[in-house]
Amino acid sequence: MEKFIESVANFIDEEDVKVLKAIGSDPIVLHSIKKIFDYPEKANKYLILLRDSPVAVYLVAKISERLSRYLEGEDEAKCFAVFLTALRELRECGDRRVLQNMFLLLKEAIERRLSDGKYEDAAKLVMEFQDFGFKSYVKKVLFFALEVSEEGDYRRAMRILELLPETDAVIDAKASVLLEWGRSLAMSNPEAGMKKIEESLRLKDTVEARLAMAEIHESMGNYEKAYFIYTSLRSLYPGIDRRIARMLMEWGEEIGDVEKLREAYNLAMGDRLLAEEIERRIKKLEAQRLSGS
């Protein structure tokens, strides 16, 4: 067991090593701690033997957290799982000093993961232990999730946000990311983009999302649906009349409907160049009708 203590001494503080040696006077405790790190997938089973020693459980959490800094992939994931399992065992601990140490360890773990870009793991810790004084960290994780979305990794941003509690800010952030994702997708796949916009609207009905939906409908040639949405926004979105006018101009010319062009002209009265272009198309369409009659 001396070798085991020496091997983990590099990952914990000097005071922790002294405590580990002290509780090591009970061979069951020390053997159980060693077994947890030999067989991390069986941590639950061996932690049962440590329930009478919150300090031992805390040391398991600390060793696994510190050790995980030097691991990657599956080994790191196993260490993180041990860390979480040990912390859960300490939830109902009545030892105030252990709980204080647990808080400091959690704070260290969350901040390290945020610094290392491991936002999903940070979000899991914040979500599970927010009642231990980590509610303020929801905003920090939220910030990094939005930064990820700015880089265009919308899927990962949503994955991080899904791990956070359903606060108003988180719901708003999800709606915003889905809106950006939908707009991005719509450039190459309008149907897929539309689905993301619809998801955004289900979370929060915003003018921006409805406008994006109208724009996608317009790009797909679904002028009637786009027109319905655009007109519903007339009292909410300044300058919408110009958008409607341009769409009506294309729609009217495409189907040969002079009335739609005239409606477009009336809406474009504040834009001289657009009004002149619509007027030109009206005259062209009327001339075509006359020549064909």
From Swiss-Prot:
Coiled coil listed as a keyword: yes
Keyword hit for Coiled coil: yes
Keyword terms, alphabetized: Coiled coil
Domain of life assignment: Archaea
Coiled coil: 195-215, 259-291
InterPro entries listed in its UniProt record: TPR-like_helical_dom_sf
Stated name of the protein: Uncharacterized protein AF_0844
